[in-house]
């Protein structure tokens, strides 16, 4: 490890620190919580003489906010907002390994590669004499991205607000200005239980669900394909779970499905529910009961790529245009709070949550250089 660059060493140390989201099922209780990462970042800020504070989010879980003041009066603000939590893994996943130019370990890709590149650039700029004259740079380590995004939602509610936020996620160093929203809906049908030998005396709730499933998997996607966003394409629908009945010889009196509806800008949770109900009505299908399975909104992200500060980041990252992605990130809650947000970072989303998660050290280095160039050129 002594031969590693300061950036690679920072990533190694971050991956070594377990930070499994405690809201997710995990049998290794000692490996849960973001507090150790927050303390680690706090220590780095303290030794560099940089101002920091905590932001309470959930019991025992806090965002860490580290602020780099400009040389003059604050006129603008930029936030770097990677999340500190990771998904569950076995203890050996927190023993980093480097092979063929890649660092392996839980969170290497999602998203400690982003923490390392963002925070290293932040600390490097703090040592520079010529820091931005009027732009405050704020590094925020967020909790709970992997579950309910409580960290970014609290940041959006309490502030600070900024001219731009960059949420750290594995984007292969592409600049993301749009992503789909996410709506989970439970649909339920009712029936009447009866003995399996005399089904005529019951009403089969699974049979009642059958035309609903057929509509959601065949007719509804055709309707959605007619609607497109320039960066995101069409919205999607997926039936993720189904539950019904207790045993083969009993006519089921209830059936439930959970659907995952990915939304594009212009759609709302209510408009989606109304659209599905109208489709059932049009096809003369008895509508099931609708209930949301999430208590917080997850709308799509749609940041204007023509914003001057977005164009500045594109130039710093050597990209000509922004892209869209189908998955949900902290950028959406942050943008809901009034701060335009992008998504950016080293690594491939295909590696996120995988058993042998890894990130290219070369990509981490390139991300750090892009962030540093961007921050250095701020006014």
Ranges and model annotations:
Residues 1-2, 36, 56, 177, ...:
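Metal-dependent amide/peptide-bond hydrolase catalytic core
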Residues 111-112, 116-184, 379:
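Acidic/histidine-rich catalytic neighborhood of metal-dependent amide-processing enzymes
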Residues 99, 121-138, 216-226, 362:
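Phosphate-handling active-site elements
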Residues 53, 78-80, 140, 164-166, ...:
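Hydrophobic/aromatic beta-strand patches that form the interior of the parallel beta-sheet core
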Residues 2-108, 127-133, 348:
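Acidic/His- and Gly-rich active-site-bordering loop/insert found
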Residues 102-117, 195, 344:
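Glycine/serine-rich anion-binding loops at beta->alpha junctions
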